[in-house]
Amino acid sequence: MHAAYIRPGGVAKNISHTLFFDISVFVRQFFKRIDEIEDMLTCNRIWNVRLRDIGFVDYKQAFDYGFSGVMLRGSGIPWDLRLLDSYDNYNLLRFFIPVGTKGDCYDRYMIRVEEWGKVCLLLNKCCIVLDI
């Protein structure tokens, strides 16, 4: 977000109803496709061979290297700035932080798949909270 977007009392331009409609259409369509995408990739032998037991990052390494995001969560560290240092209106939303157990590429992939669904739900919640 650009610094000029946020203004005293709000933002430079509120979300339009057209954009809201486009977002809600996308979320509905994407949410329906998540299972299809997951089935296609998660059950794929080649995908599994290339992701499982590859690119291990353990708990200590994740901290030592200063990783963030899915790299931390894949190593078993439940870190999400939206929950831990609630800024904007994230304190009005309830969601949990998906974490991995092995710290490999497959864990990080599975976290991302889980986040796809959670993001769709969060977008719907945001629209309700913002009363759009």
What are these regions (language model features)?
Residues 1-132:
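Active-site bordering "gate/hinge" segments
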